[in-house]
């Protein structure tokens, strides 16, 4: 055998060494070969070949055990050609076309995603009637949970005989600045609803009789003030804080019997001198009561009983008289009444952050909606409702109705601002919804109401979908 060995191992090794040296000369322009970095290149090529072979082998195994476009054991399928959704009901060998992914998940009881299958594969399986919830959202994605819910009225042409009111629902964080912000304690706004006049303050709404100039002048409402209308939704959201009218004083005008001068009859106002501002009192049948400046002004404007100014009485005399309580709803100081011409936007905002024991409500007024600049014009003008909705993604909410007899309810609000009732916790879990945020019914109740999302509703068969009873033609220029 030795006669057939034309080269030796040493010769082969030397030949390979010379090849590497030539390679160094060409690539590195150096034949000394103090180091050999080129050896890593060959190793990288070898490693790449190995990885490629492993990937090809894995793809071949996956294609064999789980071929693409085959049904397998999956129950939620989608046609790769038409994107039609199908479900295979448990215990059935029929495919059921389903209207939306929401219905499919409710039927199957989990939040799985559809598997794409070839049309040829689906055509080999028998099919039944379509099932699902007509009008349900295709899916139930959620955005950033909203902790602030706001209802706004914007009055157009407030000086006209019939001002127009536009309602907006803001399910997002507000942008407060010098142009729009909370009403201060010393501010108010005059509005009307169904023929009645109301004064809006930081705490809510107060009914007020504009013909009672004794009260209106005392609280700072000018004679030229004109109430502007508000929507039913905003009226219901603003809490009723009671009427701004003076309580009647029994036996007003009769002589007092508490030891005051004769000119101070029951119902009259006097003052005591103090180091700061004078303290006003009103005479009652069985004593005297402290009143603030606006109440004193309103009482005197109603009937001053011939007194040009409130008489001054020594504090030592007043101290001997029984002190009673005269309950007046009027503020301590006259208000700065905001005009709708300057502040056409009026809002009620509800906010409850995680950990808060109770929600915080705020009355907001200003020249524009409290939205950031990039959100202006992004509202959804609902067809079935009277509002424009500004919302950041879908919301899963749990709300407490103002009526304690109703109890709690869960809703999913889709990115179009439509609310859908969630039947129970199981339905929410099957839709992939968790961690509902708190929301006020005063705002949620104004959204367009969609169907209830439940398994029972999703298991209803249909020949065809009913027509929309309230369609709207696409605006010109959009289609």
Curated annotation (Swiss-Prot):
Region of interest: Structural repeat C2/4: 392-447
Disulphide-bridged cysteine pairs: 152-347
Transmembrane domains' residue ranges: 45-65
A Gene Ontology molecular function term of the record: hydrolase activity
Chain positions covered by the region annotation Structural repeat A1/1: 75-127
Periplasmic topological domain residue ranges: 66-479
Knockout mutant characteristics: Increases efficiency of DNA conjugation when disrupted in donor strain. Loss of secretion of EsxA and EsxB, but not their expression.
Location(s) in or outside the cell: Cell inner membrane
Protein keywords: ATP-binding, Cell inner membrane, Cell membrane, Disulfide bond, Hydrolase, Membrane, Nucleotide-binding, Repeat, Transmembrane, Transmembrane helix, Transport
Topology versus the membrane: Single-pass membrane protein
Positions in coiled-coil regions: none
Region listing for Structural repeat A2/3, in residue ranges: 267-323
Residue segments, region Structural repeat C1/2: 187-243
Gene Ontology cellular component annotations, sorted alphabetically: extracellular region; plasma membrane
Other facts noted in the record for this chain: DNA conjugation in M.smegmatis is unidirectional with distinct donor and recipient strains; mc(2)155 is a donor strain while MKD8 is a recipient strain. Mutations in a donor strain that alter DNA transfer do not always alter DNA transfer in a recipient strain.
Family statement drawn from the similarity comment of this UniProt entry: Belongs to the EccB family.
Domain remarks in the Swiss-Prot or TrEMBL record: Has a discontinuous central core of beta sheets stabilized by a disulfide bond that is flanked by 2 structural domain repeats on each side; the protein forms an elongated 'S'-shaped structure.
Known partners and oligomeric status: Part of the ESX-1 / type VII secretion system (T7SS), which is composed of cytosolic and membrane components. The ESX-1 membrane complex is composed of EccB1, EccCa1, EccCb1, EccD1 and EccE1.
Function: An ATPase (shown for residues 72-479). Part of the ESX-1 / type VII specialized secretion system (T7SS), which exports several proteins including EsxA and EsxB. Plays a role in DNA conjugation, in both donor and recipient strains.
This protein's name: ESX-1 secretion system ATPase EccB1
The gene coding this protein: eccB1
């Amino acid at each position: 055998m030795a006669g057939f060995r034309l080269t030796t191992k040493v010769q082969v090794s030397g030949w390979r060494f010379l090849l590497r040296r030539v390679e160094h000369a060409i690539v590195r322009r150096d034949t000394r070969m103090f180091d050999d970095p080129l050896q890593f290149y060959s190793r990288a090529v070898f490693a790449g070949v190995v990885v490629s072979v492993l990937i090809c082998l894995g793809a071949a195994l996956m294609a064999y055990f789980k071929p693409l476009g085959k049904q397998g054991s999956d129950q939620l399928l989608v046609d790769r050609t038409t994107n039609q959704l199908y479900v295979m009901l448990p215990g059935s060998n029929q495919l059921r076309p389903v209207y939306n992914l929401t219905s499919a998940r409710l039927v199957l009881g989990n939040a799985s995603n559809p598997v794409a299958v070839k049309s040829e594969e689906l055509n080999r399986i028998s099919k039944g009637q379509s099932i699902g919830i007509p009008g349900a959202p295709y899916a139930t994605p959620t955005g950033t949970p909203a902790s602030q819910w706001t209802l706004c009225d914007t009055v157009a042409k407030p000086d006209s005989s019939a001002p127009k009111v536009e309602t907006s629902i803001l399910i997002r964080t507000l942008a407060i600045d010098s142009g729009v912000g909370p009403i201060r304690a010393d501010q108010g706004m005059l509005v009307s609803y169904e023929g009645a006049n109301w004064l809006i303050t930081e705490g809510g709404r107060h009914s007020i009789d504009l013909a009672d100039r004794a009260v209106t002048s005392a609280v700072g409402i000018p004679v030229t003030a004109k109430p502007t209308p508000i929507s039913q939704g905003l009226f219901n959201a603003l809490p009723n804080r009671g009427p701004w009218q003076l309580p009647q004083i029994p036996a007003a005008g009769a002589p007092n019997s508490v030891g005051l001068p004769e000119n101070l009859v029951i119902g009259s106002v006097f003052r005591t001198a103090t180091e700061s501002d004078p303290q006003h009192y009103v005479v009652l049948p069985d004593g005297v009561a402290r009143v603030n400046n606006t109440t004193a002004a309103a009482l005197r404007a109603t009937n001053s009983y011939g007194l040009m100014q409130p008489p001054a009485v020594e504090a030592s005399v007043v101290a001997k008289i029984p002190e009673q309580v005269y309950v007046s709803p009027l503020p301590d100081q006259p208000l700065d009444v905001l005009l709708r011409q300057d502040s056409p936007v009026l809002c009620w905002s509800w906010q409850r952050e995680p950990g808060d024991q109770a929600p915080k409500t705020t009355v907001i007024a200003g020249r524009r909606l409290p939205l950031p600049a990039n959100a202006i014009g992004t509202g959804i003008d609902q067809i079935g409702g009277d509002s424009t909705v500004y919302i950041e993604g879908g919301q899963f909410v749990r709300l407490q109705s103002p009526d304690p007899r109703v109890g709690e309810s869960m809703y999913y609000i889709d990115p179009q601002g439509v609310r859908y009732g969630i039947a129970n916790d199981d339905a929410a879990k099957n839709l992939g919804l968790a961690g509902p945020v708190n929301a006020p019914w005063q705002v949620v109740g104004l959204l367009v109401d969609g169907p209830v999302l439940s398994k029972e509703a999703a298991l209803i068969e249909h020949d065809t979908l009913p027509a929309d009873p309230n369609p709207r033609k696409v605006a010109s220029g959009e289609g």
